[in-house]
Design a protein with these regions (language model features):
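PAPS-dependent sulfotransferase catalytic domain
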Residues: 1-91, 101
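PAPS-dependent sulfotransferases, especially Golgi type II membrane carbohydrate sulfotransferases
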Residues: 13, 17-19, 33, 52, ...
Length: 188
């Protein structure tokens, strides 16, 4: 769900304080500046459109929400598709790397309720509006229901702040890109 991706990316800068204390402060700041609902919405859209180009019998698509609700069943399907042996230990992953939860090396497994977090807060009506506006066709195709958020004052704020966001994000990411224009074209 692109709205859950939005919420995760909005909180990504907090990783340093949720157990990933080796992340430099500069990287946390860069993650905070990189977040904007229009940017993240466009990135999600571009990645979904790119994946849809490769739909054939050699590709298996599994929605994140489906996987975490039935991890055992979905992993068996994936292993069968890949023609590899299934082992239940494959699901014993460390619970680390979340933008919303503290790392817990003692806890293993899949968080089965780690979806639709955007419904319980964390995103404004404006963020939800832009996410759905930019992704409505792809969301519908993948079976995600629209929240029917409406254009509001906060939506206008995100629209007018977008050019400034792009400038600051480019400045903080220049060293990470070989060719700025090629990098932008690939992602949008």
């Amino acid at each position: 769900d692109p709205r859950d991706v939005l919420l995760s990316q909005k909180s990504k800068w907090k990783r340093k304080f949720l157990g990933a204390d080796k992340i430099p402060l500069k990287e946390s700041i860069r993650s905070w500046v990189n977040y904007h609902p229009i940017t993240i919405g466009k990135l999600w859209n571009a990645s979904v459109r790119a994946s849809l180009k490769f739909q054939n019998s050699n590709i298996k698509t599994v929605l994140f929400e489906e996987f975490i609700q039935c991890p055992d069943q979905k992993l068996k399907e994936i292993c069968s598709f890949l023609n590899i042996s299934y082992d239940s230990e494959m699901l014993d992953v460390e619970q680390a790397g979340s933008s919303n939860f503290r790392d817990d090396s003692k806890e293993k497994g899949i968080r089965k309720n780690n979806f639709e977090k955007w419904k319980t807060g964390g995103l404004s009506q404006g963020e939800i509006f832009w996410c759905e506006f930019l992704n409505r066709d792809e969301m519908s195709l993948l079976g995600y229901e629209l929240f029917s958020s409406k254009f509001s004052l906060i939506s206008i704020y995100y629209l007018f702040s977008f050019p400034f966001h792009i400038i600051f994000a480019l400045m903080l990411n220049l060293s990470r890109m070989n060719n700025v224009f090629s990098s932008i074209k690939k992602r949008i």
